């Protein structure tokens, strides 16, 4: 939820109220104080990757099939000719190798929501793409102004171009840390659909997950959940039946689970 709307999927906030609603949703549900944002469309991401010369991504044959399907839409959005990743189907769906792909295909890979892992795997793919982009930027930071010139028409942000350029030039100082899908402890599937009438991911519990998130992001700092977080957490627990007694008995993708490499500022 945010200050404008009732409970719904978190990602519906942007569609309903744009950046202001999105920031409100994040701040209200996670006890943050975010004021700035950057959003990009498919074309911006694909164009940025092309300026970097494409990416080398390890993909299974099954992921190649899905990426090729998504690329029909992405290549059209980018305004480039459709291309497909070649693969040998005789090697089976699980066969994996590193493939050099264009911006459109890398964006298509990041969109895959099918196969094992569900939404957590999809967001993992997105972090893989961002990780690889940062690595290439560190190798050639002079590409940053070219990327900005290429993509700014497809970017919505509260920051000025000069502010983005200044932030981007610090890319060479970034190190690669670890991150996890969020919420850390969660539930989804048939039981949630039966309880809520919607196919959604729910935190178990919201209050527990927000505590864990603040400890992960700001280790050692004292934090107590706001009244809003506690209220929303109790509401979700009552509606779903997944309360604090279920912590530790549901899917765990937080600290202690397998992590992904992501960006961490020095």
Describe the function of each predicted region.
Residues 42-45, 112, 228:
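Aromatic-residue hotspot detector
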